[in-house]
Amino acid sequence: MTLLVISPDYASHLYPLATLATAWQAEGERVVVATGAATDAVVRAFGYDREHLQLGRGSNPGVIRAEEQPPGEDDALRGFFDATRRGAVAALEFQARARGDDLLWNAVGVAREVQAIVERVQPDAVIVDHLAFGARLGLVGAQVPHADVVLGHPTALTVGDEVYGHPPTWPRAMRPADEELADLRVLCEGVRDTFTAQWNAALKDLRPSAQPSRDAFAETGDLLLLNYPAALHEPERTALLPPHTFLGSAVREEPRDAQVEAWLDADEGSVVYASLGSFPSARPDALALTAPA
């Protein structure tokens, strides 16, 4: 049996997908990962085979740096960093405006490459990152059964009257003004409609008889998997999801790091672990505020 895993060329996306695939590996099955060159070392470390697939312009092997991105993507990354300095709404607005170029980059080309990979690998099962829209177009276009994995918070898959990119809830301490949120929703609704039109145009190219989508951000695969604990998800929202399975957290084993072990052993005090993710970690000012706190 062969499992095909399709992931963007970002370590943060690949790690949980690769961890999920260890269940197949433990049974002696073959695992093939379709992703880019930047995360090749991650694929090899898990003991998997790799098929080359470029789902977007950017990549992140673990630590993201604008100067290591291709032309155009470097400026986009710097623009996003600048937007985070202006606040949460500014960051969300920046992401919304870049969404089509980001998530549907070279949509038909990516879709056809995915179809070619499926033809070469002949997988018995396929799991794909929910945000790999170009890859999912390829699978849907060729009617390849697949599991669609939502890696982040479940709101990455919109339900009900939610609009992608417009958080349905906010922490009280940082909730923006109602006017800002209203403007953000209008922007995100426009992006949703444009994105869905792009999705439908690509899908029609790939399979003319396919049913067009009303909201591409709400589309799911044959099996929906959520990398999130069911106990932490609002029951009202769970009731609106299509058939699904909550996976909990993708906990993986990693080799012990002697340098980290020595650092921890040198001080018997409590340790607070603050995980900001790749993008906020590129903000020295944010790190400087977090450390004293």
Predicted regions span which residues?
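Conserved nucleotide-sugar phosphate-binding/catalytic loop shared by glycosyltransferases and other
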Residues: A34, A38-A91
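Active-site-proximal region of nucleotide-activated glycan assembly enzymes
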Residues: P145-H233
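Generic beta-sheet signal
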Residues: I6, A34, L53-G56, A147-L151, ...
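Donor-nucleotide binding loops and adjacent catalytic segments primarily
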Residues: N227-A293
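N-terminal subdomain of nucleotide-sugar transferases
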Residues: M1-G58
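Conserved nucleotide-sugar donor-interacting segment of glycosyltransferase catalytic cores
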Residues: V63, R97-E179, A231-L232
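Conserved nucleotide-sugar donor-binding subdomain of glycosyltransferases
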Residues: Q69-F133, E179-D215
